[in-house]
Amino acid sequence: MADQHLIIELKTLSEKLDGDIRSDSASCILYATDASPYREIPLAVARPRTNQDIKKLILFAREHKLSLIPRTAGTSLAGQVVGSGIVVDVSRYMTRLLELNVEKHWIRVEPGVILDELNQFVATHGLFFGPETSTSSRCMMGGMVGNNSCGAHSIIYGSTRDHLISVKVILSDGSEA
């Protein structure tokens, strides 16, 4: 159980975010597992709306020596999104298709975009994002990048990394790369 001082500081941080932070028991229990058999109740769950929210979370975690656990849909079978720190769930608010360039065959998306929804959108332009995962109706682009997801036809279409031109990330010091 986190000390009261840390809970108060989390509430103060939440007021500075466009997104939200939840530290109630029910929310934390919901994020204690993914599709794996592993289970660990996190300190809190943050749902950022913006990159600035993520940067504020990073600074808070560094100051308090807490881990941040990035999460999208939680469909992985290996427990990557389970931990005792702050789960950073981008699946709630960071779900936009930002820009499509049909001529050059690329799209820019936020990490919470669901694979099937992405493919439904680009199919209207004769395009397809190659990795065919068994969880395509719920897996999200951020998790696919983090896991280098692949699928039944990877020998033909390749894995996620084979379809990336670039990735914009926020590093552990809060800088962007």
Segments from the language model and where they lie:
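N-terminal glycine-rich flavin-associated loop
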Residues: L13, S36-L68, I86, V90-T135, ...
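N-terminal accessory segments
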Residues: M1-A35, F60-L68
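Conserved PLP cofactor-binding pocket of PLP-dependent enzymes
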Residues: R71
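Beta-rich nucleic-acid/ligand-interaction surfaces
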Residues: R138-G142
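A short acidic, often aromatic-flanked loop/helix-cap motif at beta-alpha or helix-coil junctions
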Residues: A26-L30, R96, S137
